[in-house]
Design a protein with these regions (language model features):
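Internal, Lys/Arg-enriched amphipathic helical interaction segments that engage polyanionic partners
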Residues: 1-61, 178-182
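Amphipathic alpha-helical interaction surfaces
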Residues: 11-14, 18, 95-103, 126-130, ...
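Charge-enriched, short contiguous segments at helix-coil
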Residues: 19-30, 134-187
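Inter-repeat boundary and helix-capping residues of tandem alpha-helical solenoids
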Residues: 62-63, 82
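Generic alpha-helical secondary structure signal
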Residues: 64-68, 119-122, 141, 145-149
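Solvent-exposed, amphipathic alpha-helical segments
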Residues: 65-76, 149-156
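Short, hydrophobic, well-ordered secondary-structure elements
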Residues: 70-102
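Short, charged amphipathic alpha-helical segments flanked by flexible coils
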Residues: 101-139
Length: 187
């Protein structure tokens, strides 16, 4: 409580000394009151994003779990959290591939005897040659890139993903994900 009061006192002093007139000071005070009145209404579960990698219209009609991953990809990229972006991009790629296999009734082709799915590397290799999935040439070619970026961000101790690692490949990713959404039957 003491820290809150000290912070408030310092902030009030700053506003008083920096305000040039009564209108400016009272405007700041009114904004504080509005902010404080809404504290109990804060929505901490809504993901705020602007569609920087995956446009909202691309995923607004799919299941909520896929929507959440798409929103997390956009929001993490927009907030410069590039390792997060890379890992979630990989996760969405893998999830949609598995759903595509399920949608085509060929999930057994990527499932071990134990019931676990193959590694993403093996799934991508199978998908690239799989006649039932019939993926486009660019999707076959570009999927390994996003597996690698996601793996580097998740597992390489000395690697940090940067905007330059992701930005040049946004269109490729968008094309892959949209194709997989259709192949998975979620769109």
């Amino acid at each position: 409580d003491k820290q809150i009061l000290d912070d408030l006192q310092n902030e009030v002093k700053r506003v008083c000394t920096s305000s040039r007139n009564w209108t400016e000071w009272s405007g700041t005070m009114e904004q504080w009151i509005t902010d404080i009145a809404g504290w109990d209404k804060d929505d901490s579960s809504t993901i705020v994003e602007a569609g920087s990698i995956l446009p909202t219209q691309m995923f607004e009609s799919v299941s909520t779990n896929i929507q959440s991953l798409c929103k997390q990809i956009n929001a993490s990229y927009e907030h410069n959290l590039y390792d997060c972006t890379a890992v979630i991009m990989r996760r969405l790629l893998e999830g949609l591939l598995v759903l595509a296999y399920q949608n085509h009734d060929i999930e057994s082709e990527i499932t071990e005897k134990s019931g676990w799915h193959f590694t993403l590397d093996k799934i991508i290799k199978n998908a690239a040659q799989n006649k039932k999935l019939a993926l486009s040439a660019n999707t076959k070619r570009d999927m390994p890139l996003f597996k690698d970026i996601g793996n580097f961000s998740a597992h390489k101790i000395w690697y940090n993903s940067t905007k330059q690692d992701i930005e040049p490949h946004i269109l490729k990713y968008r094309v892959i994900i949209e194709e997989l959404m259709y192949k998975a039957g979620v769109k």
